[in-house]
């Protein structure tokens, strides 16, 4: 039941992030990002047997990256990475 509530909250949050337009500040519009600057490699670990099985399932079905400001089109928000980064995932094809 707790998993269902957590997954529902994540889905609703991801939906809200995708539907809300993000307002750029003057500072953000004046700075240029270097290609690949947003992409960061991340290692995620879960404790216990159940967490290990969940991690294996997620790693097979999803490709996840850490992004600076928002997830790209086709990606969903799946939590945070180290620091201010967002964990954005998409399904494997």
UniProtKB/Swiss-Prot annotation:
Biological processes per GO annotation: defense response to bacterium
Any Pfam family the entry gives: Defensin_propep
Signal peptide (from-to): 1-19
Principal place of residence: secreted
Cellular localisation: Secreted
Gene Ontology cellular component annotations, sorted alphabetically: extracellular space
Keywords, comma-separated and alphabetical: Antibiotic, Antimicrobial, Defensin, Disulfide bond, Secreted, Signal
Chain residue ranges for the region called Disordered: 22-41
SMART domains recorded: Defensin_propep (SM01418), DEFSN (SM00048)
Disulfide bonds: 64-89, 66-81, 71-88
Stretches with biased composition (Acidic residues): 25-40
Residues that make up the propeptide removed upon maturation: 20-58
UniProt keyword Disulfide bond, yes or no: yes
Family recorded in the similarity comment: Belongs to the alpha-defensin family.
Function as written in the Swiss-Prot or TrEMBL entry: May have microbicidal activities.
Protein name: Alpha-defensin 22
Species: Mus musculus
């Amino acid at each position: 039941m707790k998993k269902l509530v957590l997954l529902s909250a994540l889905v609703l949050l991801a939906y809200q992030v995708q539907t809300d337009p993000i307002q750029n500040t003057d500072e953000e519009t004046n700075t240029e990002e270097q290609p690949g600057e947003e992409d960061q490699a991340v290692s995620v670990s879960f404790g216990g047997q159940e967490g290990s099985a969940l991690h294996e399932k997620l790693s097979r079905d999803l490709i996840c990256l850490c992004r600076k400001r928002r997830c790209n089109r086709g990606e969903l928000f799946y939590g945070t990475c180290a620091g201010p980064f967002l964990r954005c995932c998409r399904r494997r094809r």
